[in-house]
């Protein structure tokens, strides 16, 4: 790590260069307000114009038209909600008599971000350690990604095949995702 040398403002050569215009605006006019006050509105208005133009010239359907007489067997959410939908779908309705219906699924969904927030505190990171080499955080993120992909793919399948992804037959169709989340979150604590 080198030491930065500050310029000597009493130096006559440097003062001559500064007098000729070599300084903070040596490369031309300053970006603010001359350049940015012109470029920002042009870019923003151009983006809005392109979006409106594409919407007018090539309108796309928002979704299928509603038909109350042809309801699908299973209504699926958008693709990015598939893991959450799979958690709600596979958790049994009542495990204990005291827990109301689907409250356990909602608690499991809330445990995902809560468990993710605890990951930085699980690791005893030395201040001189490379922050990109965190084995616990890397392992948790890889396992979490695999579980999210597994839940997402399973949500698109029928309930009979959703837990095994149709790869093998299982007698335990109502296999609970609770075990997966217990393994995922509580094995590192």
UniProtKB/Swiss-Prot annotation:
Q: Which domain of life is it from?
A: Eukaryota
According to Swiss-Prot or TrEMBL, what is its membrane topology? Multi-pass membrane protein
Q: Can you supply a Gene Ontology BP term from the record?
A: photosynthetic electron transport chain
Ordered alphabetically, the record's keywords are: Chloroplast, Electron transport, Membrane, Photosynthesis, Plastid, Thylakoid, Transmembrane, Transmembrane helix, Transport
Localization, per the record, is: Plastid, Chloroplast thylakoid membrane
What NCBIfam families does this protein map onto?
A: cytb6_f_IV
Q: Per its UniProt record, what PANTHER family does this chain match?
A: CYTOCHROME B (PTHR19271:SF40)
Q: What is this protein called?
A: Cytochrome b6-f complex subunit 4
Question: Which species is this record about?
Answer: Pinus koraiensis
Organism classification:
Eukaryota, Viridiplantae, Streptophyta, Embryophyta, Tracheophyta
């Amino acid at each position: 790590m080198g030491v930065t040398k500050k310029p000597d403002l009493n130096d006559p050569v440097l003062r001559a260069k500064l007098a000729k215009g070599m300084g903070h605006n040596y490369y031309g006019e300053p970006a603010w307000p001359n350049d940015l006050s012109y470029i920002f509105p042009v870019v923003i208005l151009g983006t809005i114009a392109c979006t409106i133009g594409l919407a007018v010239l090539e309108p796309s359907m928002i979704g299928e038209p509603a038909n109350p007489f042809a309801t699908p067997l299973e209504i699926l959410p958008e693709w990015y909600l598939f893991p959450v939908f799979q958690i709600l779908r596979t958790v049994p309705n009542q495990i204990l008599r005291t827990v109301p219906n689907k409250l356990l699924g909602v608690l499991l969904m809330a445990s995902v971000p809560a468990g993710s927030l605890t990951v930085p505190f699980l690791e005893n990171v030395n201040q001189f350690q490379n922050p990109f080499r965190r084995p616990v955080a890397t392992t948790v993120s890889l396992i979490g990604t695999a579980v999210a992909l597994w839940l997402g793919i399973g949500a698109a399948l029928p309930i009979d095949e959703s837990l095994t992804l149709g790869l093998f037959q299982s007698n335990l169709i109502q296999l609970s995702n609770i075990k997966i989340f217990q393994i995922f979150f509580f094995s590192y604590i």
